[in-house]
């Protein structure tokens, strides 16, 4: 699974970005990603505009036919955390609401912070864990060894890391995930009971790369 955070988004100074803004096009980053896209992969894309636009940006810079996706799927389950009424609001107003709440060193919110009419990061982690568990079951049943390129969001990728490494959500919020970066996981399905050489040590997910810049191969 190659998780790609979308391009930067259009936003107004002094305001929280809207929930579904357009992506800003960085030609150099899209070109670099186009060069390193795997062959014969399946692309899974969050339905928000910024991820769909990023996938299209990268597609324009693929180097050869084998890099074009075997299939594409829009997946609502990997959508970004919904900030509810905070999306598009003035930053000063949001900070005023957050002032009396518990603080986080590296995020404006704690995992348990409840955005008005929105979704807690802790709840997003549960949502992503459910999605990944479904993928784990499918991979084991189908013996699927295909590569999946996932065009998603910073908090989605943090939630993925939380699930794969059993990190508490507040710790996952401390992980930097940059625009156009790749975070790569391999999944090792458990073998049938009674016929397994695997141990519980290490879990079933291996991190191959974290927050890899688009400029690196």
For the regions a language model picked out, list residue spans one by one:
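Active-site-proximal alpha-helix that buttresses catalytic centers in soluble enzyme cores
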Residues: 1-66
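Short beta-strand scaffold positions
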Residues: 45-46, 126, 151-152
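Phosphate-handling substructures
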Residues: 17-20, 60-133
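Generic beta-sheet signal
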Residues: 1, 41, 142-155
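Active-site metal-binding loops of divalent metal-dependent hydrolases
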Residues: 7, 154, 213
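Acidic, low-complexity terminal tails and accessory targeting/binding regions
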Residues: 60, 81-93, 141-146, 162-217
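Generic structural signal for well-ordered alpha-helical scaffold segments
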Residues: 30-35, 125, 129-140, 161
């Amino acid at each position: 699974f190659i998780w790609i955070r979308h391009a930067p988004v259009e936003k107004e100074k002094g305001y929280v970005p809207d929930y579904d803004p357009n992506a800003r096009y960085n030609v150099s980053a899209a070109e670099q990603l186009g060069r390193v896209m795997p062959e014969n992969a399946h692309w899974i894309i969050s339905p928000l505009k910024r991820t769909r636009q990023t996938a299209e940006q990268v597609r324009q810079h693929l180097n050869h036919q084998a890099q074009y996706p075997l299939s594409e799927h829009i997946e609502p389950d990997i959508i970004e955390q919904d900030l509810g009424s905070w999306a598009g609001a003035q930053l000063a107003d949001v900070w005023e609401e957050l002032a009396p709440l518990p603080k986080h060193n590296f995020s404006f919110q704690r995992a348990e912070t409840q955005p008005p009419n929105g979704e807690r990061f802790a709840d997003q982690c549960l949502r992503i864990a459910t999605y990944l568990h479904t993928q784990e079951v499918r991979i084991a049943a189908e013996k699927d060894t295909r590569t999946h390129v996932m065009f998603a969001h910073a908090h989605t990728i943090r939630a993925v890391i939380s699930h794969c490494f059993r990190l508490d959500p507040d710790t996952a919020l401390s992980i930097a995930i940059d625009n156009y970066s790749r975070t790569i996981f391999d999944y090792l399905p458990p073998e049938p009971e009674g016929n397994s050489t695997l141990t519980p040590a290490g879990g079933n997910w291996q991190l191959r790369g974290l927050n890899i810049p688009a400029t690196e191969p």
